A protein has these predicted regions:
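Helix-loop boundary and gating motifs at the non-cytosolic
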Residues: 1-41
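Hydrophobic core of transmembrane alpha-helices in multi-pass small-molecule transporters
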Residues: 5, 86-103
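Residue-level signature of mid-helix packing/kink "hotspots" within the transmembrane helices
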Residues: 41-49, 137-138
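Helix-to-loop junctions at the C-terminal end of transmembrane segments
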Residues: 46-60, 148
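Cytoplasmic membrane-interface "Motif A"-like loop-to-helix N-cap segments
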Residues: 57-69
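C-terminal ends and interior cores of transmembrane alpha-helices
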Residues: 70-84
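Cytoplasmic helix-loop-helix junction between adjacent transmembrane helices
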Residues: 96-131
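Symmetry-related core transmembrane helices of the 12-TM Major Facilitator Superfamily/SLC fold
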Residues: 155-173
Length: 198
């Protein structure tokens, strides 16, 4: 649930400011910005296909969530730190399409997990998770608006990069916990195995 809330933080804090940063702050011409958005949309479609193909082949979908989260942290971190037209265009067109696929990856993992663990309540729980995502859209924009007005509009990218890192941390902890439990279970099974007489 927390991962979807922070996913909502990412979208709610940045999507409304793309044109402000690109056109008003960095001075990208309107026509160029339109091309950037078109290229980003096409790259997003390609990223969805690639990640969909990978999700059927990786051992654990959570690895893709971590990869998307770290990609997003690097991309938005670059915009925040470099603050020029080239970095904004490259990140928007080539990096963020893969990072923004994190929502579908989180939902796919949640559906698989909930269907296996609580098949009777899976649909309800998925709806609840979508509500958590929507809550961020309701409460985050005023705060990032105040932040952008009182400091710099680039600060919103620092917020989004931090949210990506939080998601990566959540899923890395989940992976580590499952790995530790599996290792402990394997060790316990080895200790409980009967000794064959010779």
């Amino acid at each position: 649930g927390m991962s979807l809330f922070f996913n909502g933080v990412i979208f709610a804090s940045t999507l409304n400011y793309g044109a402000i940063v690109g056109i008003d702050t960095l001075g990208i011409p309107n026509a160029t910005y339109a091309v950037v958005l078109m290229a980003s949309s096409l790259a997003g479609a390609a990223a969805s296909v690639i990640l969909g193909w990978l999700s059927d082949r990786v051992r654990d979908r959570r690895l893709l969530v971590v990869a998307c989260a770290l990609t997003g942290a690097i991309g938005f971190g670059a915009i925040y730190l470099i603050r020029d037209q080239l970095s904004f265009i490259l990140v928007t067109c080539a990096v963020m399409p893969f990072a923004f696929a994190i929502f579908s990856q989180i939902m796919a993992h949640a559906r698989v997990h909930l269907t296996a663990a609580q098949p009777g309540r899976a649909d309800f729980m998925i709806s609840a998770l979508r509500t958590v995502f929507a809550v961020a859209w309701a409460i985050v924009p005023p705060f990032v608006g105040i932040l952008a007005a009182s400091t710099s509009v680039f600060e919103i990218y620092a917020v989004a990069a931090a949210a990506f890192l939080v998601i990566a941390a959540i899923y890395l902890v989940m992976l580590w916990t499952d790995r530790a439990a599996w290792t402990a279970g394997k060790a316990g099974g080895a200790r409980a195995a009967p000794v064959r007489p010779t």
